[in-house]
Regions:
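Transmembrane helix recognition focused on a "late"/terminal membrane span
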Residues: 1-17, 40-131
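Membrane interfacial helix-start motif at the N-side
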Residues: 5-9, 19-36
């Protein structure tokens, strides 16, 4: 493969990874993996929405301790769901019930799962998986 083709492949892989982070499944959609894109969007979106429906907390950027920083990193992985949740969450987490804690964990799990799909989209974009 010549240099130009390698550079084009790297650009496609980076664009797919960034798109996949911003909107779960969009990176696979860019790579024309229709079914994977739909499954990833529905699963990650479902986890994020379930976490918010349970009044789970969303970690902010101004974290003071390591746990909150890791929570912010995990939540940030959810892409557009994080930014929407950060804007619409006005009441705060439900700390009086266990469901609020479960919701916080579900939202963080959605973000971490999206990071895995971003890595997969990048790998596919680089030619790491048979088409």
């Amino acid at each position: 493969m010549n240099r130009q083709a390698v550079k084009g492949t790297q650009i496609i892989a980076i664009v797919a990874a960034l798109a996949g982070w911003l909107v779960p499944g969009l990176g696979h959609l860019v790579l024309r993996r229709w079914s994977k894109a739909a499954v990833y969007f529905l699963c990650i979106g479902g986890l994020a929405c379930a976490g918010l429906a349970m009044r789970g907390g969303v970690f902010g950027a101004g974290a003071e301790d390591l746990f909150n920083r890791l929570g912010f990193f995990a939540d940030l992985g959810a892409g557009v769901f994080y930014f929407l949740a950060h804007q619409i969450q006005t009441a705060g987490p439900d700390v009086a019930h266990a469901t609020g804690d479960y919701g916080t964990r579900l939202f963080a799990a959605a973000g971490m799962l999206n990071f895995l799909t971003v890595l997969e989209a990048y790998d596919i974009g680089r030619g790491g998986e048979a088409k």
